[in-house]
């Protein structure tokens, strides 16, 4: 039985690397995976055949992988992610795990006052962010289901979705099919097992080739710390042919930000909080954090803010210049990992800064 990422499991990271003493990581599957992916055994099913038709293709410092490219594959994935299966995407043993109760926190139409710090609470204020941020579901190569968070961003193809690289694949050879996850299904605005704007399969995806590392010598926290934990997805259109951004709207994307101290808002779908590993969160509602950004430990390409989100929040957007009235801002990074601050203070959630590699991925996606 696997320990959920982010929970105390007795694992001490002794691998040399940038974050050896700073970040909590966990081993999931056969390779080390950055914390914050939510793993779960597939509900009563054996491992599935991948829905992909092509293997990995390496070009221009990125590694791309084909997704659901046929109508049959898209239909199978859509049928697979039932409301119950989505709700159980954080359970270790779905066969005996009660389906989580719905979160009935009431909506609040009033805008959140600007620059209000928040270490973790249900987002109830609506706006664009409630439509273009959602839960990204997938199946590991051994048949276990998992989930992350992802965001629709503005782009020429109107189909670009950004998340963390470790939500797409583990470190290792990009040509090895078992490093890639499968059955990708993005549900924007996910809420209590429902799909208010529908569900979207993925046509293709890519990570930086620098994310590809030797799993015998490198923890994925090392390459995350180097700023490469960014993944881009190109979503298939909705049933009527509309691109996803026409359905959900989109957030702007920015590169080379934020400045230290810049106020940033983070969103995600965690299964639990770092300080409260009980039933504080169950992945049913989108959680919000906000505060001034600060540098990550021992690397300029990780930065974060105080936030009590853990497994499931990976890939979630960190937005600068966020307008709490409209729910719009600029995505300047995605959640990569976490650190519990010293002295009993609240934990921090760290994002990978969008640098040259992230820009290359974004440009690649626009022609797909």
Outline where the language-model segments fall.
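Acidic glycine-/aspartate-rich tracts in secreted/extracellular proteins
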Residues: 167-168, 190-193, 237-240, 271-272, ...
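Protease-domain processing segments flanking chymotrypsin-fold serine proteases, especially trypsin-like
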Residues: 2-4, 39, 43-155
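Conserved catalytic-core segment of clan PA serine endopeptidases
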Residues: 119-142, 153-154, 178-242
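Catalytic histidine site
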Residues: 125-192, 289-297, 306, 351
């Amino acid at each position: 039985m696997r320990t959920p990422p982010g929970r105390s499991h007795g694992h001490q990271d002794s691998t040399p690397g940038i974050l050896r003493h700073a970040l909590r990581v966990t081993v999931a599957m056969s390779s080390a995976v950055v914390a914050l992916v939510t793993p779960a055994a597939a509900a009563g099913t054996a491992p599935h055949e991948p829905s992909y038709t092509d293997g990995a293709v390496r070009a221009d410092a990125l590694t791309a992988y084909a997704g659901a490219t046929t109508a049959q594959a898209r239909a199978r994935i859509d049928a697979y992610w039932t409301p119950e299966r989505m709700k159980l995407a954080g359970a270790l043993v779905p066969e005996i795990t009660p389906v989580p109760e719905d979160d009935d926190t009431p909506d609040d139409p009033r805008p959140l006052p600007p620059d209000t710090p928040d270490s973790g609470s249900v987002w109830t204020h609506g706006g664009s962010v409630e439509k273009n941020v959602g839960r990204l579901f997938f199946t590991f190569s051994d048949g276990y289901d998992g989930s992350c968070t992802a965001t629709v961003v503005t782009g020429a193809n109107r189909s670009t979705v950004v998340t963390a690289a470790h939500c797409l694949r583990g470190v290792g050879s990009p040509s090895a099919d078992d490093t890639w996850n499968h059955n990708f299904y993005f549900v924007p605005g996910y809420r209590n097992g429902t799909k208010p704007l529908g569900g979207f399969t993925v046509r293709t995806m890519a990570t930086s080739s620098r994310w590809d590392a030797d799993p015998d010598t490198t923890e994925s926290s090392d390459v995350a710390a180097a700023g490469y934990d960014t993944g881009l997805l190109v979503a298939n259109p909705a049933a009527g042919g509309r691109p996803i951004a026409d359905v959900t709207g989109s957030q702007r994307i920015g590169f080379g930000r934020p400045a230290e101290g810049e106020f940033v808002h983070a969103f995600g779908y965690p299964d639990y909080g770092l300080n409260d590993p009980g039933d504080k969160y169950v992945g049913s509602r989108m959680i919000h954090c906000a505060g001034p950004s600060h540098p990550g430990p021992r690397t300029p390409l990780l930065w974060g803010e105080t936030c009590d989100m853990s497994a499931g929040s990976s890939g979630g957007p960190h937005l600068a210049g966020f307008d709490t009235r409209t729910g719009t801002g600029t995505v300047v990074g995605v959640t990569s990992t976490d650190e519990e601050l010293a002295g009993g203070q609240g934990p921090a959630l760290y994002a990978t800064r969008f640098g040259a590699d992230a820009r290359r991925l974004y440009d690649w996606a626009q022609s797909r």
